[in-house]
């Protein structure tokens, strides 16, 4: 789709979102067509909610988030087939794989293990592997990435190339508030088992999060070597583990509860990262 076509689509979506109180399952015409077209573009990876710019910053295409939100108003609940034991689900969003045959899977080029769930409008790039996991609408999973068992990729989350999301990892979805950016995991990152990255935080390229690291917008991310504290973003090629920081003393006492933080235990360059095992990086 050309830039003028995208601009026209964006204009229609923006206007419809401003007038969303009047949009419902009976709405037809230009608005419905624009929303459906937007979701197809997301599903094919021809458009994405956020795009990395040359300066390293991420540009968020808020109109595509609006299209996703409008789809909830437009689409009625319906039976979704494919449940265990020939049962069904009851939802507004069909499976990405609805109606797929071997031909569609071969063209898509990724591996979808039984019991993985991907909702329509999420993009999965070639050579990705989906274990029994959940990928929500509007998300983008790039080439060579492994989404391991029971991992969750939230709505509109952006997952880079050659990322490993270990078992039980949660990557938070961000649809609202509208001004919030999506959660982003850049290329060549490793996210350890049962870790959570949420609230539009960014894990920059080449970083390693150990098992059980939780990062939200208010989480202190402390560089042990410098004392520098980051919020909402893990710097590139950081090795991060769960830790604690001293808290304030309780009234009348000389002690207080420690508070959770994430600790950058080391930083490595790209060459070291590519040649060193994850276990070696985390051993300190």
Curated annotation (Swiss-Prot):
Keywords: Acyltransferase, Amino-acid biosynthesis, Cytoplasm, Diaminopimelate biosynthesis, Lysine biosynthesis, Repeat, Transferase. The keyword Nucleotide-binding does not apply. GO terms for cellular component: cytoplasm. Pathway: Amino-acid biosynthesis; L-lysine biosynthesis via DAP pathway; LL-2,6-diaminopimelate from (S)-tetrahydrodipicolinate (succinylase route): step 1/3. GO terms for biological process: diaminopimelate biosynthetic process; lysine biosynthetic process via diaminopimelate. GO terms for molecular function: 2,3,4,5-tetrahydropyridine-2,6-dicarboxylate N-succinyltransferase activity; nucleotidyltransferase activity. Its EC number is 2.3.1.117. InterPro entries: DapD_Trfase_Hexpep_rpt_fam, Hexapep, Hexapep_transf_CS, THP_succinylTrfase_dom1, THP_succinylTrfase_N_sf, Trimer_LpxA-like_sf. It holds the Pfam family THDPS_N_2. CDD domains: LbH_THP_succinylT (cd03350). It catalyses: (S)-2,3,4,5-tetrahydrodipicolinate + succinyl-CoA + H2O = (S)-2-succinylamino-6-oxoheptanedioate + CoA. It is found in: Cytoplasm. The keyword Transmembrane helix does not apply. Substrate binds at residues 111, 148. PANTHER family: 2,3,4,5-TETRAHYDROPYRIDINE-2,6-DICARBOXYLATE N-SUCCINYLTRANSFERASE, MOLYBDENUM COFACTOR GUANYLYLTRANSFERASE. Belongs to the transferase hexapeptide repeat family. Homotrimer. This is 2,3,4,5-tetrahydropyridine-2,6-dicarboxylate N-succinyltransferase. It comes from Brucella anthropi (strain ATCC 49188 / DSM 6882 / CCUG 24695 / JCM 21032 / LMG 3331 / NBRC 15819 / NCTC 12168 / Alc 37).
């Amino acid at each position: 789709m050309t830039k003028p076509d995208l601009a026209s689509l964006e204009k229609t979506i923006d206007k419809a979102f401003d007038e969303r109180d009047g949009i419902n399952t009976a709405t037809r015409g230009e608005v419905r067509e624009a929303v459906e077209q937007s979701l197809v573009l997301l599903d094919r990876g021809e458009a994405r909610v956020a795009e990395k710019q040359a300066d390293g910053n991420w540009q968020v295409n808020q109109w595509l988030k609006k299209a996703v939100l409008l789809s909830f108003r437009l689409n009625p609940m319906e039976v979704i087939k494919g449940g265990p034991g020939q049962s069904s689900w009851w939802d507004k969003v069909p499976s990405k794989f609805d109606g797929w045959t071997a031909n569609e899977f071969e063209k898509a080029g990724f591996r979808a293990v039984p019991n993985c769930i991907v909702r329509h409008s999420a993009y999965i790039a070639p050579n990705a592997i989906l274990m029994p996991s959940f990928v929500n609408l509007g998300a983008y999973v790039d080439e060579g990435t492994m989404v391991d068992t029971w991992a969750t990729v939230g709505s509109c989350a952006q997952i880079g190339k050659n990322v490993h999301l270990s078992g039980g990892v949660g990557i938070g979805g961000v649809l609202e508030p509208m001004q919030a950016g999506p959660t982003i995991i850049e290329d060549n990152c490793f996210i350890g088992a049962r870790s959570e990255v949420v609230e539009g935080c960014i894990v920059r390229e080449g970083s390693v999060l150990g098992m059980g690291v939780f990062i939200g917008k208010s989480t202190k991310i402390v560089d042990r070597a410098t004392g520098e504290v980051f919020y909402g973003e893990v710097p590139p090629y950081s090795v991060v583990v769960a830790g604690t920081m001293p808290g304030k003393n309780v009234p009348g006492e000389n002690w207080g509860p420690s508070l959770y933080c994430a600790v950058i235990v080391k930083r490595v360059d790209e060459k070291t990262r590519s040649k060193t095992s994850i276990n070696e990086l985390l051993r300190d």
